Amino acid sequence: MAKKTIRVRQTGSAIRRPKDQRATLVGLGLNKIGRERELEDTPSVRGMIAKVSHMVEIVEE
């Protein structure tokens, strides 16, 4: 069975954000506005996305 994936795009800057939020973006593989990553759809990834939801958007599930 194929694993479910989720595509995420960074829409906001990490400048003047707390270190934990910047680290979460790095953990998601994002570091510049406009970058997209396809990630495995797991509860831990969903939690990371929720933590920085003001800086990322879900492109497709």
Curated annotation (Swiss-Prot):
User: Would the keyword Ribonucleoprotein be found if you checked this record's keyword annotation?
Assistant: yes
Q: Name one GO cellular component term.
A: cytosolic large ribosomal subunit
Q: Name one GO molecular function term.
A: structural constituent of ribosome
Asked if the keyword Cytoplasm belongs to this entry, the reply reads no
Please list the coiled coil stretches. Answer: none
Gene Ontology biological process terms in this record: translation
What domain of life? Bacteria
Its keywords, alphabetically, are:
Ribonucleoprotein, Ribosomal protein
Q: Name one Pfam family in it.
A: Ribosomal_L30
Assembly description: Part of the 50S ribosomal subunit.
NCBIfam families listed in its UniProt record = rpmD_bact (TIGR01308)
Read off the PANTHER family from this record: LARGE RIBOSOMAL SUBUNIT PROTEIN UL30M, MITOCHONDRIAL RIBOSOMAL PROTEIN L30
Family stated for the protein in its record: Belongs to the universal ribosomal protein uL30 family.
> What's this protein's name?
Large ribosomal subunit protein uL30
Q: Which organism is it from?
A: Maricaulis maris (strain MCS10) (Caulobacter maris)
Classification lineage? Bacteria, Pseudomonadati, Pseudomonadota, Alphaproteobacteria, Maricaulales
